[in-house]
Design a protein with these regions (language model features):
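N-terminal targeting signals for export/organelle localization
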Residues: 1-58, 62, 253-254
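Short active-site neighborhood of thiol/selenol oxidoreductases, capturing the structured segment around
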Residues: 69-99, 117-118
Length: 254
């Protein structure tokens, strides 16, 4: 079953504070968080996606190849926005692999030049362009292809864009488990809730003594820089459902 965009918090062992805070922010524009949900339901009935909030603007971030990128680079395009940790052993590799499949579907649909995948590195203090490039390559993407921009910056820049701008929480958690157990830090936060465990060769090789816990969300940003959909289980979003939503933003049938 394909996942639909939702404002409901997923029962995931991840931080949900940013999206909860987002409901309060949106209350100013829609009257309340209930109003936002009602708008989503009305929109679904009308087969359109509501405007949720403006995506943040930024400049002088760096992509996986070390090139400077600003938010203006995506003007006039639909963006599929993700938040990824290069050494992740849970959701991020699954999300990346799914987005590669989605990009291939875009290409076969003739829409590749109208849509960009934009992801943000939620470990800006510990990893940089080299690790980001290796991560994309590990999960099937040609890192030189400009249709996927994996962005990083200083910790302050990324915190401003990701948490203040997109309302997505993340935090660094030091590993209190045994050496080499890169999932134990996340489990310390998650408790007994199950998480998918994915073998990430980059994480195995680096063996860093920490994890980054973050919200498992995917967002759609329209050609005018407005967030139009939030999927709160990014690793479960089907590529055909995502393509349908993208087509609606592009004014295409199908």
């Amino acid at each position: 079953m394909q996942q639909q965009p939702s404002t409901q918090a997923a029962s995931r062992p991840l931080l949900r504070g940013g999206i909860a805070a987002l409901c309060l922010v949106l209350g100013a524009g829609l009257g309340s968080a209930i109003g936002w949900r009602a708008a989503m339901h009305r929109s679904a009935a009308q087969r359109t996606l509501p405007v949720l909030f403006n995506a943040p603007t930024y400049r002088d971030l760096r992509n996986q190849n070390g090139d400077k990128v600003s938010s203006q680079a995506f003007d006039g395009k639909v963006q599929v926005v993700a938040f990824l940790f290069p050494y992740c052993n849970t959701f991020c590799p699954v999300i990346a692999a799914h987005l590669v499949g989605f990009e291939n579907l875009l290409a076969s649909s003739g829409l590749a030049d109208k849509v960009d995948v934009v992801s943000f590195n939620v470990d800006p203090g510990g990893t940089g362009p080299r690790q980001m490039r290796e991560f994309l390559q590990e999960y099937g993407w040609d890192a030189s292809n400009p249709r996927w921009q994996y962005l990083t910056g200083t910790p302050a820049q990324i915190r401003s864009v990701v948490t203040s701008g997109f309302h997505v929480d993340y935090q660094k958690v030091m590993d209190q488990g045994s050496a080499g157990d890169s999932s134990s830090a996340a489990l310390a936060v998650a408790g007994s809730d199950p998480q998918p465990q994915v073998v990430n060769p980059l994480a195995t090789k680096a063996d860093v003594p920490y994890d980054i816990t973050h919200e498992d969300v995917l967002m759609l940003v329209d050609q005018r820089g407005r967030v139009r959909a939030i999927y709160d289980q990014a690793d479960a979003v089907g590529k055909f459902a995502l393509l349908k939503a993208v087509r609606s933003l592009l004014g295409r049938a199908g």
